[in-house]
């Protein structure tokens, strides 16, 4: 019980600090300490504790919708409005992703831009590994910037490959894409979608795509919303990880913390509304079971 733990630690640490660490309000703690919550039924008390535990476990990354899904998975019969109400009572506020601000990698006008193969494609994908989307984003470090390259399966939202480095040369995206290939062979004709940055136009990357018979697709010129899927992903990663690490101390820390977040949390635990409120890994497992049964 979070409040009981705060009470146990209070002789050694200030209440204000403990409440901040555990993500609860001082007023809610003092209500508990003064016995004002004694009239609450056991069932409601259990629900409050479950909400608080989920919120703390996911490090303020879950709002009412995902907490509701987690509660239902645990056997609670609860609606989103009820969760919202409990979160307000407990003064729990989830991290909010930043607004999408379009950015782009540097384009190379000397190299031809591939067409956008997703424009008239409906639905965008019907199964795994049909469309892989990628991009590069920036992350502040102690001395300079770090560059994160990510490739994501558009159907399952699983991050299949990523690399962070102190440069944004073509090697950055090819190393990340090599991890995609490590997950298994991509069928010929799989669409690989990105912006028109010079890294994606490089001979090295295009030769890699030709070798595996993959189709390259790029956003239209000055239309960054063509790759909104990956931009939304970056917005979420930065909001949820920068809250703890606004600036990495060095490349080693960046690699460790991104591995913990992407491979240890985002792919395996974090519920996604676009895939039925489950994690990408669980979604892929369910998809494989379904295709085997058919």
What spans do the regions from the language model cover?
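Charged DNA-binding/catalytic regions of mobile-element recombinases
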Residues: 1-294
């Amino acid at each position: 019980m979070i409040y009981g733990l705060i009470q146990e630690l209070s002789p050694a640490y200030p209440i204000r600090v403990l409440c901040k660490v555990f993500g609860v309000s001082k007023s809610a703690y003092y209500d508990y300490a003064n016995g004002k919550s004694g009239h609450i039924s056991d069932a409601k008390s259990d629900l409050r504790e479950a909400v608080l535990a989920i919120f703390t476990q996911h490090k303020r990354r879950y709002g009412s919708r995902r907490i509701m899904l987690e509660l239902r998975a645990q056997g609670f019969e609860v609606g989103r409005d009820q969760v919202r109400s409990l979160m307000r009572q407990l003064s729990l506020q989830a991290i909010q992703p930043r607004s999408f601000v379009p950015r782009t990698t540097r384009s190379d006008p000397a190299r031809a831009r591939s067409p956008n193969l997703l424009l008239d494609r409906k639905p965008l994908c019907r199964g795994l590994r049909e469309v892989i989307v990628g991009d590069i984003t920036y992350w502040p470090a102690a001395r300079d910037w770090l560059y994160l390259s990510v490739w994501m399966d558009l159907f399952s939202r699983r991050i299949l490959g990523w690399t962070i480095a102190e440069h944004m040369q073509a090697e950055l995206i090819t190393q990340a894409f090599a991890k995609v290939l490590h997950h298994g062979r991509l069928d010929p004709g799989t669409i690989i979608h990105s912006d028109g940055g010079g890294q994606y136009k490089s001979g090295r990357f295009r030769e890699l795509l030709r070798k595996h018979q993959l189709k390259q697709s790029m956003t239209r010129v000055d239309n960054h919303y063509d790759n909104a899927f990956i931009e939304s992903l970056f917005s979420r990663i930065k909001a949820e990880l920068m809250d703890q690490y606004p600036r990495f101390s060095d490349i080693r820390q960046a690699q460790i913390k991104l591995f913990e977040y992407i491979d240890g949390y985002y792919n395996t635990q974090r519920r996604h509304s676009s895939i039925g409120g489950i994690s990408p890994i669980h979604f892929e497992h369910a998809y494989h079971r379904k295709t085997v049964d058919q």
